[in-house]
C-alpha cells in the first residue's frame, strides 16, 4: 500500500535544495560582482543608471550602483547588503568587498560541486580571515597622533587614495586638503552631520570652498527684505519654530459680531498679537532671526526697520546645525527669549555664489562644524562629486580614529595572499586546499586593477608574486607606468580598518551563502499585481 504523501507547503511553493541550488546562488553573486567589477581603481569606468522615473545617475561607487539596481535574487541581495554596510561603516572599499565575496565563492565552487561539506569550507574561511586580520594589524604602519604635521600628511594621502578612483581624481589634491580641513574642524566625536555639503550649479570645480561654520541657501523672502542689513559682527541669533505672519483662522473659527467696532476689535487683536510677538523678539536683543515656519511681509518689514535680519522656512537640518554650531536652542514660543536660548557667532553675512544667495555663519563658538560648497556643471556630476567627498570624509574619520595605514593598489592583498599560501603548505588535509583557494581569491583586487587599466594582468601578477616572495611586502600595481612599485613610498595609503572591514564582511557573506542548503519561495511573493480595473465615466475600458 502506498504511503499517503504529506503536503506541508502551500501549492505553488517553489523549493530548491541541494548542491544545484547552492551553485545557482554562487552564480547569482558572481553576476552582481560583474556589475561593479569595472568600477574598481583609478582607471575604473563609471555606470549610468536610469531609474523608473527617468532620473539618471552617474556613479563609480559600488554601494550606490548596487543600491540603484533593483536586485530580487535573495542570495545576491546579501552582496548588496555588505556593500551598504561597508559604505556606512568605512565609506570606501565598497566595490572591493563585493568583488572579494564573489571571488571567495568562485574559488570554492568546484569543491561545492564535488560535494565537500559547507561547514568545512566555513571553518577554513574563518581561520583564513582571522589569520589575515592579524597579519594586517601586525604589518600596518602606525602614525603618531602627537605629531600633527605627520598625521595631517597621512590623512591627506588616505583621502587622495579614496578620491583617485572617482570622477574628480584630477582635482584630488585640492579636495583631499579640503576634506582633511573639514574633518579637522570637528570635535572628538567626528559627527558626519556636522559637515554640510551644498551644491551650487555653475562655475569650475576649483571654485568649491570650505566654510568654517554653517552656510545655507537663502530662503524665500517677502517684500521689505531688501532693506535688511546683510552683514553683522557678533550678532545674537534667535532660532524659532514660530509662525510670524497674519493668516486666516484655522479650524472653522466662527465669530458673531453685531457692530463694526466689534469687528475692528477682532482685527486689532490679531495685529496686536503679531506685534506683541515681534516686540518680544526685538526686546531679546537678537539681530538674526531664523524660523522653521514662514515669516510674513509685516514681520519682514518690522525687522528691517529695526536693522534685524530674518529668514523663514529654514530647512530643519540647517536650523539644527546652526543651533549646534552657534549655541542656543530652538524655541516654539517667543515668551521666554532669555539670553541663554540665543546663539551667537562672530560674523553673519549673506553673499552671492553663482546664481544663488547664501547665508553664512562663521566663527561659531560652540561646535566645530563646517560646510563644503561645491561648484560644477552638470547636476549628475555634482551629485557624484558629493558622493566622492562623502567617501573621502568617512575615510579620514576612520584614519583619525584608527591611526594605522597600509599600502593600497593591491599591495596588502598580495602580501596576505603570499602569507596564507605559505601557511596552507604547513597544514594537511582539506583545509590546505581551502585556505589556498582563499589566498588565490585575494589576488582578484590587483588583477582587476590591471584589467581596468588595460594592462597585462598575468604578467604584472607574476612580477608581484616574485617581488613579495623576496620580501617586498608593499609592492602593488603602479597604474601610471604599467608596472609594479612600492606603493607605500608612492603614498597610496589606506586606513588598515578599510581592509580589515572589507575582508571580514566579504568572508562572512561568503560563509552565509555557502551555509544555505535550501531556498523556499512562497507563491504569493511571485504573483503579479492585479491589473487595474476598468475606469468609470467617459474613459471606459475597451476590449478588442
Swiss-Prot record:
The modification N6-acetyllysine is found at residues 67, 250, 320. One of its GO terms (biological process) is chaperone mediated protein folding independent of cofactor. The N-terminus is blocked. Mg(2+) binds at residue 92. SUPFAM superfamilies: GroEL apical domain-like, GroEL equatorial domain-like, GroEL-intermediate domain like. The modification Omega-N-methylarginine is found at residue 536. It catalyses: ATP + H2O = ADP + phosphate + H(+). It is found in: Cytoplasm. Keywords: Acetylation, ATP-binding, Chaperone, Cytoplasm, Hydrolase, Isopeptide bond, Magnesium, Metal-binding, Methylation, Nucleotide-binding, Ubl conjugation. The modification N-acetylmethionine is found at residue 1. InterPro entries: Chap_CCT_eta (IPR012720), Chaperone_TCP-1 (IPR017998), Chaperonin_TCP-1_CS (IPR002194), Cpn60/GroEL/TCP-1 (IPR002423), GroEL-like_apical_dom_sf (IPR027409), GROEL-like_equatorial_sf (IPR027413), TCP-1-like_intermed_sf (IPR027410), TCP-1_chaperonin (IPR053374). GO terms for cellular component: cell body; chaperonin-containing T-complex; microtubule; mitochondrion; zona pellucida receptor complex. ATP binds at residues 41, 93, 96, 398, 409, 499. Component of the chaperonin-containing T-complex (TRiC), a molecular chaperone complex that assists the folding of actin, tubulin and other proteins upon ATP hydrolysis. The TRiC complex mediates the folding of WRAP53/TCAB1, thereby regulating telomere maintenance. Belongs to the TCP-1 chaperonin family. This is T-complex protein 1 subunit eta. The lineage of its organism: Eukaryota, Metazoa, Chordata, Craniata, Vertebrata.
Amino acid at each position: 500500500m502506498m504511503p499517503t504523501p504529506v503536503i506541508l507547503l502551500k501549492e505553488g511553493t517553489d523549493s530548491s535544495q541541494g548542491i544545484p541550488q547552492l551553485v545557482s546562488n554562487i552564480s547569482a553573486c558572481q553576476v552582481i560582482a560583474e556589475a561593479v567589477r569595472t568600477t574598481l581603481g583609478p582607471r575604473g569606468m563609471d555606470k549610468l543608471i536610469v531609474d523608473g522615473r527617468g532620473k539618471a545617475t552617474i556613479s563609480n561607487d559600488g554601494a550606490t550602483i548596487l543600491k540603484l539596481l533593483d536586485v530580487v535574487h535573495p542570495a545576491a541581495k546579501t552582496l548588496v547588503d555588505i556593500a551598504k554596510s561597508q559604505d556606512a561603516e568605512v565609506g570606501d572599499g565598497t566595490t572591493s568587498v563585493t568583488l572579494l565575496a564573489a571571488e571567495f565563492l568562485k574559488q570554492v565552487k568546484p569543491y561545492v560541486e564535488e560535494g565537500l561539506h559547507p561547514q568545512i569550507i566555513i571553518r577554513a574561511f574563518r581561520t583564513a580571515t582571522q589569520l589575515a586580520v592579524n597579519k594586517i594589524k601586525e604589518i600596518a604602519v602606525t602614525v603618531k597622533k602627537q605629531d600633527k604635521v605627520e598625521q595631517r600628511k597621512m590623512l591627506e594621502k588616505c583621502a587622495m587614495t579614496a578620491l583617485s578612483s572617482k570622477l574628480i581624481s584630477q582635482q584630488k589634491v585640492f579636495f583631499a586638503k579640503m576634506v582633511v580641513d573639514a574633518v579637522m574642524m570637528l570635535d572628538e566625536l567626528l559627527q558626519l552631520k556636522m559637515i554640510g555639503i551644498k551644491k551650487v550649479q555653475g562655475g569650475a570645480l576649483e571654485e568649491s570652498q570650505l566654510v568654517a561654520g554653517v552656510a545655507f541657501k537663502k530662503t524665500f523672502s517677502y517684500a521689505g527684505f531688501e532693506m535688511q542689513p546683510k552683514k553683522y559682527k557678533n550678532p545674537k541669533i534667535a532660532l524659532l519654530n514660530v509662525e510670524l505672519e497674519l493668516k486666516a483662522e484655522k479650524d472653522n473659527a466662527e465669530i458673531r459680531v453685531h457692530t463694526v467696532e466689534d469687528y475692528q476689535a477682532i482685527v486689532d487683536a490679531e495685529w496686536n498679537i503679531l506685534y506683541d510677538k515681534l516686540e518680544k523678539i526685538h526686546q531679546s536683543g537678537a539681530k538674526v532671526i531664523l524660523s522653521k515656519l514662514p515669516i510674513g511681509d509685516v514681520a519682514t518689514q518690522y525687522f528691517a526697520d529695526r536693522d534685524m535680519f530674518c529668514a523663514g522656512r529654514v530647512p530643519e537640518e540647517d536650523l539644527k546645525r546652526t543651533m549646534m554650531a552657534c549655541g542656543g536652542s530652538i524655541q516654539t514660543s517667543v515668551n521666554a527669549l532669555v539670553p541663554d536660548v540665543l546663539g551667537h557667532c562672530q560674523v553673519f553675512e549673506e553673499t552671492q555664489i553663482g546664481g544663488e544667495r547664501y547665508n553664512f555663519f562663521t566663527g561659531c563658538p560652540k561646535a566645530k562644524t563646517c560646510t563644503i560648497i561645491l561648484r560644477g556643471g552638470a547636476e549628475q556630476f555634482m551629485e557624484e562629486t558629493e558622493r566622492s567627498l562623502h567617501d573621502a570624509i568617512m575615510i579620514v574619520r576612520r584614519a583619525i580614529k584608527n591611526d594605522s595605514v597600509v599600502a593600497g593598489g593591491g599591495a596588502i592583498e598580495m602580501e596576505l595572499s603570499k602569507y596564507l599560501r605559505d601557511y596552507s603548505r604547513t597544514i594537511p588535509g582539506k583545509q590546505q586546499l581551502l585556505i589556498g583557494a582563499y589566498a588565490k581569491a585575494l589576488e582578484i583586487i590587483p588583477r582587476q586593477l590591471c584589467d581596468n587599466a588595460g594592462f597585462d594582468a598575468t604578467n604584472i601578477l607574476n612580477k608581484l608574486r616574485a617581488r613579495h616572495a623576496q620580501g617586498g611586502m608593499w609592492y602593488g600595481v603602479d597604474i601610471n607606468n604599467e608596472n609594479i612599485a612600492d606603493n607605500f613610498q608612492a603614498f597610496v595609503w589606506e586606513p588598515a580598518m578599510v581592509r580589515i572591514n572589507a575582508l571580514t564582511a566579504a568572508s562572512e557573506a561568503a560563509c552565509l551563502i555557502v551555509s544555505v542548503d535550501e531556498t523556499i519561495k512562497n507563491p504569493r511573493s511571485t504573483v503579479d499585481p492585479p491589473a487595474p480595473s476598468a475606469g468609470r465615466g467617459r474613459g471606459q475600458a475597451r476590449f478588442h
